[in-house]
Design a protein with these regions (language model features):
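Gly/Ser-rich helix-loop-strand patches that form or flank binding pockets
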Residues: 1-45, 129-174
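Short beta->alpha connector loops
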Residues: 11-12, 118-121
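Residues that cap or flank secondary-structure elements
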Residues: 15-16, 61, 65, 117, ...
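Amphipathic coiled-coil/heptad-repeat helices and related helical stalk/stem segments
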Residues: 20, 66-69, 121-122, 152
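Short acidic active-site motifs
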Residues: 23, 96, 120-126, 155
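Active-site phosphate/pyrophosphate- and oxyanion-stabilizing loops and adjacent acidic/basic residues
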Residues: 25, 71-74, 101, 126, ...
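Small/aliphatic-rich secondary-structure junction motif
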Residues: 44-115, 168
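Short, surface-exposed amphipathic charged segments that create phosphate/polyanion-binding patches used
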Residues: 50-51, 127-131
Length: 174
């Protein structure tokens, strides 16, 4: 979680966070269903959902995860009145316009709501969530175990401490 007294600063030191198992990371790594991590202290109407996908995914697992993320985000948006769906993906500078077009098609959103950002996936998600004032970010996680999980973590885990929005993590088990 985040220390509410210091906006934008993680509660856990990043190096310590990578090496120690914290309850939220353990839940994410062992989940067999989507996990909702609530950051907001009060329930508020859902006005903006952000689907975080990898438009450049080149393997079946990540493409399937993209499909599941978009399906969850679309369902949540359709269940709320006056809610808008945005989509974000990190991309290379040379492909930005083409990837933004692909992202809009993939997510089924107007081009103005498809954000292909030249950044790391974590930074693209966090920056876009702040820019569009997302109430909820839907993100995917490919479950990892062992030393690789301990050292690298994944984008959902890295974004967890710095996002202000609630986070719905859709897990794809390998």
């Amino acid at each position: 979680g985040r220390d509410r007294g210091r906006p934008g600063r993680p509660l856990h030191h990043p190096a310590r966070r990578r090496l120690l198992k914290t309850s939220d990371w353990v839940v994410l790594r062992r989940a067999v269903c989507p996990v909702l991590l609530v950051k907001q202290e009060q329930a508020t109407p859902l006005r903006c959902v952000l689907a975080a996908v990898d438009v450049e995914a080149d393997d079946d697992a990540h493409r399937q995860l993209n499909t599941e993320i978009i399906a969850c985000a679309t369902q949540l948006k359709s269940g709320a009145s006056d809610c808008v769906l945005h989509a974000v993906s990190a991309c290379q500078a040379s492909d930005r316009l083409r990837q933004a077009t692909r992202l809009a098609t993939m997510a089924g959103v107007e081009p103005a709501y498809a954000h292909a950002l030249v950044a790391t996936p974590e930074d693209a998600i966090v920056d876009c969530a702040a820019w569009v004032a997302a109430d909820l970010v839907v993100i995917g996680s490919v479950a990892r175990h062992g030393l690789g999980a301990k050292i690298h973590g994944n984008t959902a885990e890295r974004a967890l401490d710095v996002l202000d929005a609630d986070l719905l993590v859709v897990t794809l088990r390998r």
